[in-house]
């Protein structure tokens, strides 16, 4: 129960946002409204879930560059948003379910927390309570930048920032260097 764990599953809301920019003049699917009005293409979803990248999601970290949205080509804006949203929720739930017995709720941050469709899918697939970090008094738009600031301070103080249970390193270690431009 006192073990520190972490996962970075890669795309978060990025694939949905990319789909919206490619298929419309919108930057994101506000509240997941387009996904809600679309229909998941189960054949495409099953095929992409069987793909190597998805199988790689058992690794500690995936990057947005590990994914693309070409699998949704030919779908309507709404059906593509629904299919990509379901794919994203499956990736997130795959990571969560590895540790599900270790926690009772999920605290979410970043833009995806405002996508009701995505959050409802994750809650349904994990059967866990989803909490928007804003409700705990934090601004969910800045958690990642604050995390990097925190890690920079720990690194500056020569404190560990990487652990076997978070990144798979053999021994806990610090990281990074400070450079000065004169």
Cite the ranges covered by each PLM segment.
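Acidic, glycine-enriched active-site microenvironments
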Residues: 1, 5, 108, 115-121
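Glycine-rich phosphate-binding loop of actin/hexokinase-like ATP-binding domains
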Residues: 1-34
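Alpha-helical scaffold segments in soluble metabolic enzymes
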Residues: 18-22, 43-50, 121, 148-151, ...
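Short helix-capping/linker segments at secondary-structure and domain boundaries
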Residues: 23-28, 96-99, 153-163
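A contiguous, well-structured pocket-lining segment that forms one wall/lid of small-molecule binding clefts
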Residues: 25-105, 116-124
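Glycine-rich beta-strand-to-loop/alpha-helix junction loops that act as flexible
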Residues: 104-115, 145
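Glycine-rich phosphate-binding/hydrolytic loop that grips phosphoryl groups
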Residues: 131-182
């Amino acid at each position: 129960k006192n073990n520190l764990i972490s996962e970075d599953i890669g795309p978060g809301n990025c694939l949905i946002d990319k789909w919206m920019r490619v298929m419309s003049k919108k930057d994101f699917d506000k509240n997941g409204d387009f996904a809600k009005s679309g229909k998941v293409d189960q054949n495409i979803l099953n095929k992409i879930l069987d793909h190597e990248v998805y199988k790689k999601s058992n690794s500690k970290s995936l990057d947005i560059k590990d994914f693309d949205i070409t699998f949704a080509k030919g779908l309507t804006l709404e059906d593509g948003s629904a299919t990509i949203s379901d794919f994203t929720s499956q990736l997130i739930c795959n990571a969560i379910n590895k540790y599900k017995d270790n926690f009772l709720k999920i605290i979410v941050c970043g833009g995806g927390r405002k996508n009701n469709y995505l959050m409802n899918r994750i809650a349904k697939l994990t059967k866990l309570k989803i909490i928007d970090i804003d409700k705990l008094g934090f601004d969910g738009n800045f958690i990642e930048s604050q995390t990097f600031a925190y890690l920079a301070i720990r690194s500056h103080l020569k404190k560990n920032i990487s652990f076997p249970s978070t990144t798979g390193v053999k021994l806990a270690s610090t990281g990074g260097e400070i450079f000065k431009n004169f």
